[in-house]
Amino acid sequence: MAKITKVEVQKNNKQKVNIYLDGEYKARMYLDTCVKYGLHAGVEIEEDRLNELVLESEKVMALNLAVKYVSTALKTKKQIVDYLKKKEFQPEIIDYVVDKMLEYRYIDDMEYIRAYFNTYSNKFGISRLQYNLRSKGVSQKLIDEYMDSLEEEMDTLSTCIALLKKKAKNMDLSDIKNRQKLSRFLASRGFEFDDINHAMMEVTKER
C-alpha cells in the first residue's frame, strides 16, 4: 500500500492533476476523477487501484471529447478514431469510446452515407460521392449497400445539366476549348462520360 503525498494541478491543463506516491510522481489523472474518488495527500492506495482509476479517467475524458466532436456535425467511425489518435489516447481507450459511440448511436456510418448523399447529390456525380465517402473512412461495401437500397436510381443527368448550365452561363459552347474545360470540370465532379456528353448536347440545344 502506497500513500499519496501530493496532488498537483497541472500548469498547462487545469483539468488534469499529477499524483505523487511516497514522494515520487506516479501518474496523471483528470481532476473530476480525482475528486470523485477522494484522492488527496494522505490517502493510502494500491498502485493497481490507482492505475484502474487513471484508465477510467482517460475513458471518461475521451468519451466526452468524442461526443463534443460529433455534436457539430455527423462523423464517421474513422473520423472519431483519427480524432482521438491526434489527442494521443491509447488504442484500448479509443476502442472503448468507439464501442460506446456505436452503442448509443452517436456514430452510424450508414446514416452518414444517407446524409452525405442527401446533401451533396446535387453537386457531385456518383463516383465522386463514393470517393469522398471512402476518404472519410466509409467502406465501399457499406456504400454499395446504400446504393442497392435506393428505390430509384439517382438522376445524375439532371444534376449534370444543372451544374453545366450554371458553369457555362457566360461561355461560348461553340468554342472547343470551353467545351473541353467544362467537360473536365464535370468529370472532376464525378460524372460519367455519357452524362457529360448528353448534358453538353442538351445545354447547347437550348441556346
Please provide the spans of the model-predicted regions:
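An alpha-helical, amphipathic repeat domain used for nucleic-acid recognition
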Residues: 1-207
